[in-house]
Regions:
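A short beta-strand motif characteristic of beta-propeller blades
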Residues: 33-39, 75-81, 116-123, 165-171, ...
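Bacterial Sec-dependent signal peptides at the C-terminal "C-region" and cleavage site
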Residues: 12-30
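Short loop/turn segments immediately following beta-strands, especially the blade-tip
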Residues: 201-209, 309-314
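A short loop-to-beta-strand structural motif that recurs across blades of beta-propeller domains
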Residues: 66-68, 104-106, 155-158, 197-199, ...
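Beta-rich, blade/repeat-based domains predominating
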Residues: 40-54, 83-100, 124-140, 169-187, ...
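Blade-level signature of beta-propeller repeat domains, shared across WD40, Kelch, NHL, RCC1
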Residues: 274-328
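Conserved beta-strand positions in repeat-built beta-propeller and related beta-rich domains
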Residues: 51-52, 57-62, 98-103, 143-151, ...
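Hydrophobic alpha-helical segments and helix pairs
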Residues: 114-171
Length: 328
């Protein structure tokens, strides 16, 4: 598997880099330590997103088929179990969310547990499943699929509107991940994990059309692969890197590495800003892909971590609601 093979190389190089620094630019890179926010053993923790109305962090364990709601003040989690993999969660109202299950998009009521299908997703006869997703500033869900063999390029990035209309936006994808929008709403940043870089697309807020605008970031060799992603108010990209022991912060305009959040787990999967002032970075991790020896060496794998990195994030967009942040 792509991620498993890359992990061995990435872990070796990441440990070496941690020991010797970052070469000529090491003094310019800020290092921040993450701490455990919630101790658990998620097989594939993913999809971290803050719910401002509830003051909680939502996230999923894809292989555990479970949606979680972490309440920071109580240090406790609520959970909801599903009969299929649950891969993405975005807020809709103060009590409903929209979820990507492995082969469909549904509305889910956190109070009543009522489920309503919005649209099915083409999984090519089970060769694909849904993966990461987020809502655009105009309230449309952008969600991608991934190839279960992590090799073929059959997957697609879709745009799902509240009406149920679904459009294919990017084809030829292997593992769709980490989509965010710039503060001026004119650009999308997007990861197809095995490529090892972050793509930039020109974005039309009104039509939803996108045009490839180049590579924003080439992930440094040996630091893992780009997974989930968040963006701060200064348009810096905070990228969870599978096999990279951390979240890496890049300048979206220059591609320069600015900071690294050190996480004591190899497989870092997603991140999201949250908290009352949107200044806490929450981070999910995974136990999947690790050998028994690696799990013994990194026993906190699967936990949710957090830190205050000195940056402020932007609130998430809600499904079906247009962002009140003004286009520049």
């Amino acid at each position: 598997m792509i991620r498993a093979c890359k992990l061995i190389q990435a872990m070796t190089v990441a440990l070496l880099l941690a020991a010797i620094g970052w070469g000529t630019s090491c003094s310019e890179v800020k290092h921040i330590n993450a701490e455990v926010a919630y101790q658990t053993e998620a097989q594939l923790g993913e999809g971290a997103i803050w719910h401002p109305d509830r003051g909680t962090l939502l996230w999923v364990d894809i292989e555990g088929r479970t949606l979680y709601e972490f309440m920071p003040e109580k240090k406790k989690c609520r959970s909801w179990k599903f009969d299929r993999r649950v891969t993405t969660v975005v807020p809709e109202t103060d009590h409903t969310v929209v979820l990507a299950l492995e082969n469909s998009i549904i509305r889910f009521d956190l109070n009543t547990r009522e489920k309503t299908e919005i649209t099915p997703i083409d999984t090519k006869g089970g060769r694909l499943r849904c993966n990461d997703g987020k809502c655009s500033p105009n309230g449309w869900l952008w969600v991608g699929t991934m190839s279960l063999d992590e090799k073929s390029s059959e997957a697609t990035l879709y745009c799902v509107r509240p009406t149920g209309r679904i459009d294919a936006m990017v084809r030829g994808v292997t593992i769709s991940n980490g989509i965010v929008w710039s503060s001026n709403k004119k650009y999308i940043y997007y990861n197809d994990t095995p490529t090892g870089h972050i793509r930039r697309f020109r974005y039309n807020l009104h039509s939803g059309d996108i045009i490839m605008n180049g590579i924003a970031v080439d992930i440094p060799e040996g630091t893992g692969l780009p997974d989930g992603m968040a963006i701060d108010r200064n348009d810096n990209l905070w990228v969870a890197q599978w096999g990279g022991f951390g979240v890496y912060c890049y300048n979206a305009y220059t591609g320069e590495l600015i900071a690294k959040v050190e996480v004591p787990a190899p497989n870092v999967t997603s991140c999201a800003f949250g908290g009352e002032h949107m200044d806490v970075l929450y981070i999910t991790t995974a136990r999947e892909g690790l050998t028994p020896d690696e799990l013994a060496a990194y026993p906190l794998s699967g936990c949710v971590f957090s830190c205050r990195p000195g940056a402020v994030g932007v609130p998430p967009n809600y499904f079906g609601q247009e962002s009140n942040q003004q286009e520049e």
